Amino acid sequence: MSQDSTIPNSNYHTMVVLGDAAWTLLANQPIDQIDIDAVADRACVDRGLAGAIAGSVQYLVLAKMSELDRQSLTEAYGDIQDAGEVSVREKIIEGLLHWFETYAPYRLQIDQLNRSARSHPDLALRLLVSLEAFIRRTLVMSGDPAFGLRGMMRVKGVAGVFLATACIWMKDDSNGLAATMKMLDQRMLQAEEWGISLRVFDVRRSHDGLNDRV
Protein backbone atom coordinates (compact mmCIF):
# COMPACT_ATOMS: atom_id res chain seq x y z
CA MET A 1 0.00 0.00 0.00
CA SER A 2 1.26 3.42 -0.89
CA GLN A 3 0.14 6.13 1.50
CA ASP A 4 1.57 8.83 3.68
CA SER A 5 1.43 7.11 7.06
CA THR A 6 2.89 8.11 10.38
CA ILE A 7 4.05 5.05 12.32
CA PRO A 8 4.06 5.78 16.08
CA ASN A 9 7.24 5.16 18.03
CA SER A 10 5.81 2.44 20.23
CA ASN A 11 3.29 -0.36 20.01
CA TYR A 12 1.47 1.07 23.02
CA HIS A 13 0.96 4.42 21.34
CA THR A 14 -0.13 2.64 18.18
CA MET A 15 -2.77 0.75 20.13
CA VAL A 16 -4.00 3.98 21.72
CA VAL A 17 -4.44 5.84 18.45
CA LEU A 18 -6.02 2.83 16.76
CA GLY A 19 -8.38 2.34 19.68
CA ASP A 20 -9.40 6.00 19.58
CA ALA A 21 -10.04 5.75 15.84
CA ALA A 22 -12.11 2.58 16.15
CA TRP A 23 -14.09 4.10 19.03
CA THR A 24 -14.86 7.21 16.97
CA LEU A 25 -16.04 5.15 13.98
CA LEU A 26 -18.20 3.00 16.25
CA ALA A 27 -20.40 5.98 17.06
CA ASN A 28 -21.85 5.91 13.55
CA GLN A 29 -21.76 2.29 12.40
CA PRO A 30 -22.00 -1.26 13.76
CA ILE A 31 -18.76 -2.81 14.89
CA ASP A 32 -18.95 -5.62 12.33
CA GLN A 33 -19.11 -3.06 9.52
CA ILE A 34 -15.92 -1.27 10.56
CA ASP A 35 -12.89 -2.43 8.61
CA ILE A 36 -9.46 -2.56 10.25
CA ASP A 37 -8.02 -0.75 7.22
CA ALA A 38 -10.48 2.12 7.70
CA VAL A 39 -9.40 2.35 11.33
CA ALA A 40 -5.74 2.39 10.31
CA ASP A 41 -6.36 5.11 7.74
CA ARG A 42 -8.22 7.28 10.24
CA ALA A 43 -5.41 6.84 12.77
CA CYS A 44 -2.71 7.48 10.12
CA VAL A 45 -1.14 4.12 10.92
CA ASP A 46 0.25 1.71 8.34
CA ARG A 47 -2.43 -0.86 7.52
CA GLY A 48 -0.10 -3.81 7.86
CA LEU A 49 1.12 -2.59 11.23
CA ALA A 50 -2.47 -2.12 12.41
CA GLY A 51 -3.29 -5.68 11.46
CA ALA A 52 -0.18 -7.03 13.14
CA ILE A 53 -0.71 -5.19 16.42
CA ALA A 54 -4.50 -5.18 16.75
CA GLY A 55 -5.78 -7.94 14.50
CA SER A 56 -9.43 -6.94 14.75
CA VAL A 57 -11.68 -3.96 15.38
CA GLN A 58 -13.37 -5.82 18.22
CA TYR A 59 -10.03 -6.13 20.00
CA LEU A 60 -9.41 -2.40 19.62
CA VAL A 61 -12.86 -1.45 20.93
CA LEU A 62 -12.52 -3.70 23.97
CA ALA A 63 -9.05 -2.29 24.64
CA LYS A 64 -10.49 1.24 24.49
CA MET A 65 -13.22 0.26 26.94
CA SER A 66 -10.62 -1.22 29.27
CA GLU A 67 -8.80 2.12 29.19
CA LEU A 68 -12.02 3.99 30.00
CA ASP A 69 -12.80 1.53 32.80
CA ARG A 70 -9.40 2.20 34.37
CA GLN A 71 -9.99 5.93 34.08
CA SER A 72 -13.38 5.74 35.80
CA LEU A 73 -12.07 3.54 38.63
CA THR A 74 -9.04 5.76 39.19
CA GLU A 75 -11.26 8.84 39.42
CA ALA A 76 -13.68 7.03 41.73
CA TYR A 77 -10.83 5.97 43.98
CA GLY A 78 -9.61 9.56 44.21
CA ASP A 79 -13.07 10.81 45.17
CA ILE A 80 -13.45 8.04 47.76
CA GLN A 81 -10.09 8.94 49.31
CA ASP A 82 -11.12 12.59 49.50
CA ALA A 83 -14.47 11.70 51.08
CA GLY A 84 -12.89 10.01 54.08
CA GLU A 85 -14.61 7.11 55.83
CA VAL A 86 -17.56 5.78 53.82
CA SER A 87 -19.29 2.40 53.69
CA VAL A 88 -18.47 -0.36 51.22
CA ARG A 89 -21.91 0.09 49.69
CA GLU A 90 -21.31 3.81 49.12
CA LYS A 91 -17.93 3.05 47.56
CA ILE A 92 -19.48 0.56 45.15
CA ILE A 93 -22.15 3.07 44.15
CA GLU A 94 -19.45 5.70 43.63
CA GLY A 95 -17.49 3.32 41.42
CA LEU A 96 -20.51 2.46 39.28
CA LEU A 97 -21.62 6.08 39.04
CA HIS A 98 -18.20 7.11 37.79
CA TRP A 99 -18.52 4.54 34.99
CA PHE A 100 -21.77 6.13 33.87
CA GLU A 101 -20.21 9.58 34.06
CA THR A 102 -17.12 8.51 32.11
CA TYR A 103 -19.16 6.87 29.35
CA ALA A 104 -21.85 9.57 29.19
CA PRO A 105 -20.31 11.16 26.05
CA TYR A 106 -20.22 7.72 24.41
CA ARG A 107 -23.82 6.55 24.56
CA LEU A 108 -23.84 6.12 20.77
CA GLN A 109 -20.96 3.65 20.99
CA ILE A 110 -22.63 1.72 23.81
CA ASP A 111 -25.88 1.58 21.85
CA GLN A 112 -24.06 0.19 18.81
CA LEU A 113 -22.38 -2.47 20.94
CA ASN A 114 -25.68 -3.45 22.57
CA ARG A 115 -27.33 -3.85 19.18
CA SER A 116 -24.45 -5.85 17.72
CA ALA A 117 -24.20 -8.10 20.78
CA ARG A 118 -27.73 -9.40 20.14
CA SER A 119 -26.63 -11.08 16.91
CA HIS A 120 -22.97 -11.76 17.76
CA PRO A 121 -22.63 -14.13 20.74
CA ASP A 122 -18.85 -13.82 20.76
CA LEU A 123 -19.09 -10.06 21.25
CA ALA A 124 -21.80 -10.46 23.89
CA LEU A 125 -19.62 -12.89 25.83
CA ARG A 126 -16.57 -10.63 25.70
CA LEU A 127 -18.60 -7.64 26.83
CA LEU A 128 -19.96 -9.66 29.74
CA VAL A 129 -16.48 -10.80 30.75
CA SER A 130 -15.28 -7.19 30.53
CA LEU A 131 -18.20 -5.98 32.65
CA GLU A 132 -17.64 -8.60 35.34
CA ALA A 133 -13.93 -7.73 35.44
CA PHE A 134 -14.86 -4.09 35.99
CA ILE A 135 -17.35 -5.01 38.72
CA ARG A 136 -14.81 -7.22 40.48
CA ARG A 137 -12.25 -4.41 40.49
CA THR A 138 -14.92 -2.05 41.83
CA LEU A 139 -15.67 -4.44 44.69
CA VAL A 140 -11.99 -4.92 45.51
CA MET A 141 -11.43 -1.15 45.46
CA SER A 142 -14.40 -0.80 47.82
CA GLY A 143 -13.02 -3.27 50.36
CA ASP A 144 -14.78 -6.45 49.24
CA PRO A 145 -12.22 -9.04 48.03
CA ALA A 146 -14.98 -10.92 46.14
CA PHE A 147 -13.28 -14.29 46.63
CA GLY A 148 -14.82 -17.72 46.20
CA LEU A 149 -18.34 -18.69 45.22
CA ARG A 150 -19.99 -15.96 47.29
CA GLY A 151 -17.65 -13.42 45.79
CA MET A 152 -18.54 -14.58 42.28
CA MET A 153 -22.24 -14.31 43.12
CA ARG A 154 -21.73 -10.79 44.49
CA VAL A 155 -19.99 -9.82 41.25
CA LYS A 156 -22.92 -11.14 39.23
CA GLY A 157 -25.41 -9.46 41.56
CA VAL A 158 -23.76 -6.06 41.19
CA ALA A 159 -23.47 -6.65 37.44
CA GLY A 160 -27.24 -7.13 37.41
CA VAL A 161 -27.64 -3.81 39.24
CA PHE A 162 -25.38 -2.19 36.67
CA LEU A 163 -27.29 -3.55 33.67
CA ALA A 164 -30.67 -2.55 35.09
CA THR A 165 -29.39 0.95 35.79
CA ALA A 166 -27.81 1.22 32.35
CA CYS A 167 -31.26 1.09 30.74
CA ILE A 168 -32.16 4.31 32.58
CA TRP A 169 -28.73 5.85 31.98
CA MET A 170 -29.06 5.50 28.20
CA LYS A 171 -31.98 7.96 28.27
CA ASP A 172 -30.91 10.08 31.24
CA ASP A 173 -30.47 13.75 30.35
CA SER A 174 -31.06 14.98 33.90
CA ASN A 175 -28.61 17.28 35.64
CA GLY A 176 -25.77 15.26 37.15
CA LEU A 177 -27.36 11.98 36.00
CA ALA A 178 -29.88 12.29 38.82
CA ALA A 179 -32.21 9.64 37.36
CA THR A 180 -29.32 7.20 37.00
CA MET A 181 -28.20 7.84 40.56
CA LYS A 182 -31.73 7.27 41.89
CA MET A 183 -32.11 3.97 40.03
CA LEU A 184 -28.63 2.85 41.06
CA ASP A 185 -29.40 3.46 44.73
CA GLN A 186 -32.74 1.65 44.48
CA ARG A 187 -31.27 -1.35 42.69
CA MET A 188 -28.37 -1.62 45.11
CA LEU A 189 -30.76 -1.66 48.06
CA GLN A 190 -32.86 -4.34 46.36
CA ALA A 191 -29.78 -6.42 45.54
CA GLU A 192 -28.60 -6.12 49.13
CA GLU A 193 -31.93 -7.40 50.46
CA TRP A 194 -31.94 -10.33 48.04
CA GLY A 195 -28.31 -11.09 48.74
CA ILE A 196 -28.84 -11.23 52.49
CA SER A 197 -31.85 -13.53 52.12
CA LEU A 198 -29.79 -15.84 49.90
CA ARG A 199 -26.75 -15.56 52.21
CA VAL A 200 -24.68 -14.05 49.40
CA PHE A 201 -24.03 -10.84 51.35
CA ASP A 202 -22.89 -10.52 54.92
CA VAL A 203 -25.77 -10.01 57.35
CA ARG A 204 -23.46 -8.26 59.85
CA ARG A 205 -24.01 -4.62 58.97
CA SER A 206 -23.37 -1.61 61.12
CA HIS A 207 -24.79 1.87 60.74
CA ASP A 208 -21.44 3.19 59.55
CA GLY A 209 -21.29 0.51 56.84
CA LEU A 210 -17.91 -0.90 57.86
CA ASN A 211 -19.22 -4.47 57.68
CA ASP A 212 -21.32 -3.98 54.56
CA ARG A 213 -20.72 -6.25 51.63
CA VAL A 214 -22.98 -4.22 49.39
What do the PLM-derived regions correspond to, one by one?
Residues 11, 15-23:
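Short, leucine-enriched amphipathic alpha-helices that occur as contiguous helical runs
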Residues 112-119:
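Short linear capping/connector segments at secondary-structure termini
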Residues 2, 17, 25-63, 67:
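Helix-turn-helix
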Residues 144-206:
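Hydrophobic/aromatic-rich alpha-helical bundle segments in the mid-to-C-terminal region
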Residues 121-144, 152-164:
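Amphipathic alpha-helical packing segments from all-alpha helical-bundle domains
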Residues 42-45, 60, 71, 75-91, ...:
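Amphipathic alpha-helical hairpins
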Residues 63, 77-112, 129:
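Hydrophobic alpha-helical connector segments
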Residues 1-13, 204-214:
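N-terminal intrinsically disordered/low-complexity leader segments
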